[in-house]
């Protein structure tokens, strides 16, 4: 509808002043044992590198790394969004620390030859009151699919990405999706998403229970 107003704040998307919980916020309820290990490792490495750090400085190390990863992700996603009208990327103008990820994306694009239809689209599920931003809707082999890009050192793909795309596919009425993990080494993983909307809804129920007071205040 032309008169709809969409905003995003505090872990929610707002459509005509009504809150829709973000998909990524819901998925935070899922325990991530590997993330706890990574957090401890980052603190250990920071102290090993600089034994003079105090506790607060050492505990801040993982957050600095996370901020760098977010900046990297934003750069790569912006590049992907602009690749459709301008497929001739000058690799020499890409910051050195991002070149591997860009190489991985270019390889993937050449291998699968997608036709991008929409990028960075906000999607809403009115029945279940959630929303999110999908990376790309595209045609691959003549079939409409959703694609989510992830950047990491080794291009790994984690379970939460499957649930994220399960939610997006349900909102968009799409039956197939892919996760593309872009690695720092210039390689990629192209994985078909295992769509299971029921599991996403189960996570959402838990999230709603844990945040029930906040939801009541917001009139969710």
Task: Give residue ranges: language-model regions.
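Metal-dependent nuclease catalytic cores that hydrolyze phosphodiester bonds in DNA/RNA
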Residues: 1-131, 220
